[in-house]
Every structure is written in structure tokens, then in C-alpha cells.
UniProtKB/Swiss-Prot annotation:
Pathway: Amino-acid biosynthesis; L-proline biosynthesis; L-glutamate 5-semialdehyde from L-glutamate: step 1/2. Its main location: cytoplasm. It catalyses: L-glutamate + ATP = L-glutamyl 5-phosphate + ADP. It comes from Bacillus cereus (strain ZK / E33L). It is found in: Cytoplasm. This is Glutamate 5-kinase. Keywords: Amino-acid biosynthesis, ATP-binding, Cytoplasm, Kinase, Nucleotide-binding, Proline biosynthesis, Transferase. Residues 276-350 form the PUA domain. The keyword Cytoplasm applies. Catalyzes the transfer of a phosphate group to glutamate to form L-glutamate 5-phosphate. GO terms for biological process: L-proline biosynthetic process. The keyword Nucleotide-binding applies.
Amino acid sequence: MKKQRIVVKIGSSSLADSHEGISKEQLSDHVAALARLKEEGHEVLLITSGAVAAGFSALGYPSRPVTIKGKQAAAAVGQSLLMQAYTEEFRKYGIVTAQLLLTRSDFSRKEQYSNAYATLGELLNRSALPIINENDSISLEELTFGDNDMLSALVSGLVSADMLMIFTDVNGLYDKNPQKNEDAKKYYFLPEVTEEIASLAGDAGSKLGTGGMKSKVDAAKTALSLGVSVFIGTGRGQEKFVDVLKGKGDGTYVGNAPQKEMKMNKQWIALHSVVSGQIEIDAGAATAIIQHGKSLLPAGVTNVSGFFQVGEVVEVMTQQGRVIGKGQCTYSAEELRDVKGMQSQHIQARGERHSYEVIHRDHWVSL
């Protein structure tokens, strides 16, 4: 089997008992299967939930807390317990683990995003197995972030994974709730995530997690847009992850032919960057960018909104108000207002710049 880079996401519902916290039996089962993937020569990253589930009983809560402060306190205790449990299990297979705790800001800030990329790459080069969780003891986002489902999709794109496996307590996607409807139809394969499929996914998750099928479907859609195929399902035993790669997984495969892989810088622009302003362009410039893959030049700019600096991300819109994309601007707002509508040779005559693109095509993402 060809060596692949695999991201496996394991949710709280696949790790924990509703009253006793983390199940050692379930965790051991997952680790044995992850070790088999490594044994087959694949690179593996683990996105794990379970910090809150691991910590609530140690703090005396009878069940998973419902308040933000309770969840964050449980996560602060549980993260170390969870990591200790993983480390001890992986040590049995001679696998070195590494812990990374991420927040949304680690993705929105370009330098931190690049650092995460470099760190994960080095860990994989050294044959370590990164274990990633949201830093939910300080992050509000995790509480509504879908039990790390979207985090797993974003990490999959960041490391250019071949596949994202989202493991849960339900064996795939159905057209209705299989626990309440005996005639529920299972989807074994979906070429894409359509609006119809998205609408079928419910909002509610299990008592242990914050997820649910909606967050998993949303994550699958994002992963596909970044060039990563997805599996959503369940399984037991040492071969369960290897079986997924062989097409024998107990769940739903999504996107046999995902979109073209998106480079790291464009991922950051598309999904994580903060928009600092807007640029309005004429029809000719829009055609050149969208249909012919050209860079945006000052001549095509008709209006500038906001106060942005060089290198910040701006939205680009047509004169009819339709946003067509965004990118990193090589001019400040003040500079661009001064040269908008001007031909490059006229700017060159000023002798002020060596480059005239407003947004280079390598730093542009169509929406």
C-alpha cells in the first residue's frame, strides 16, 4: 500500500464513558489501530477530544459540566491525564508522541500558522506522532467548535493529508436518525457535500461531546475544499484504520476525488485571515483574475475602502458589489488610493516601485 499521510480525529463519544471519564479499553483500542497505521509505513496525526471528559470526575463533577468555567476547569485537569494515558499506551509500541494545543488565533495569525506548519512537518520527519487538541482550558471557541471536527479538517489541509478519518459513535451518515428510524438509509459514499446532505445532519451531539453529524459534515466539506478525502464512521480492533484505507471501513466515504490541494499560504488567506479592507475593481480586471489567473494591477482598481497596511488581506469586489475573492495587498490603502486606475508604465515613471501588482496571483484566493 502506498505511504499516505493520515489525520485521525477521535471524538469524546469514542473515548469516554458518560460517568467515569476516559475509557482505558477504548483508548487502548484506538492506539493499537493507530500503531498499525504507523507499522504499515503511514504518517499519522491524531486529533483528540476528551480533555473535559477526562477531567470532570477528578474535580468531583457527577457528569460533564455545562458551564463554561466548569468545562474549562475540567479541561485543564483532563488534558494532562489524557496525554499521559496516550503516551503510556503508545510507548508499548515504541512510538514517540508530541502534544500540540491549538486555538483559533493560532490559525488566524500568519506567523503562528506558519510555525504550526513547520513544527508538524518536523515531527513527522522525525517519525513522531503528533497528538493535537484545542486548548480548551482557555479557548471559548472549542465549546462551540464541533468537538474538534473543524480543527481536524483545518489541520488536514495544513499538512496536505491524503485522508481525514473522523471516528465517532455512529457508523456513517444517514438520511435520518438511525436510532429513531428503522428505515434510515445509510450513505456509503458521497462524492461531495451538497446543501441537501448538509441539511440532513442534525445539530445535537452525544452527552459526552459537543459535536454531532452537522459539525462532521461541515468539517468534511472544508477538508474536501483543501484537497483531503474524508471518512466518517466507527470501528473496533487493531485493523480498523487500515481497513478504512482499503475501502472496508464501517462508515461513509466522502469525496473520492477532492478538489486540488491548496497551498498553505492560500489556505491561510481563504480560511483564517482577518479582512482589513475592500478593493473594488472593474469588469476587465475581474475577468483577467477569475478566468485567466492574472494578478490584480492598479489600472483595474476603481475604489478602495478601509485602512489597511502592506501585506494585509483585503476582499475584492466587482462594481456591482459581488465579492469575488481576497488576497494579500502589496499596497497600503493610502498608497493604493493614490495609484488606483493608473497604468503600470505611469507608476513606473514615478520611480517609486519595482513591482506593480496590487495582489499577486500567488497570494489570491477566489471565493
